[in-house]
Amino acid sequence: MNTKYSEEQGDGSFMKHLILASGSPRRRELMSQVGLDFTVVTSDADENIKEMEPEDYVRELSSIKAQSVLEQYADKDDSVIVIGADTIVYHKGEILTKPKDEEDAFRILKSLEGQIHQVYTGVTICSTHKNVSFYEKTDVWVYDMTDEEIRDYISTGEPVSYTHLRAHETGAYL
């Protein structure tokens, strides 16, 4: 991806250097679809944080990721804007994180089928001058599936790759 570093526009303003602090293929795809010119820099920050309400959890993790990447650039380029994001599933009072393996993915999908759960995404946009964090919550219903359907879906590798088993990322709606 080509990145524009403070390239002067016709009106004398300057283009900011936009960085996505995420390795998520889906987030890259979304930013590309809206025509943003950006660089991907993944965060190596410690993401182990204390338990808290899901909306606070995703905002905190998105902030940790964005701030970690911003720190790498803050002294060199004050035109940097960093976007960090984190997504989790929340079901029956529990934050569900990325499945450890196929059996864990099966257990999680089995617990979600036929029920509504919430998907929370927190986003932080930060620069050396300002930070903004917000979250969105979506109710998701997973239909009842046979064990074979679940195992077939898991065999694609999608559930283990995505934090919250979002089949809609690849079109395999559940």
Show the residue positions of the predicted features.
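N-terminal beta1-alpha1 ligand-phosphate binding loop
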Residues: 16-36
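A short beta-strand-loop structural module common to alpha/beta enzyme folds
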Residues: 39-46
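Residue-level detector of conserved catalytic or cofactor/ligand-binding positions
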Residues: 8, 164-174
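Anionic-ligand binding patches
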Residues: 16-19, 40, 53-166
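Short, Lys/Arg-enriched N-terminal segments with co-localized hydrophobic residues
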Residues: 5-14
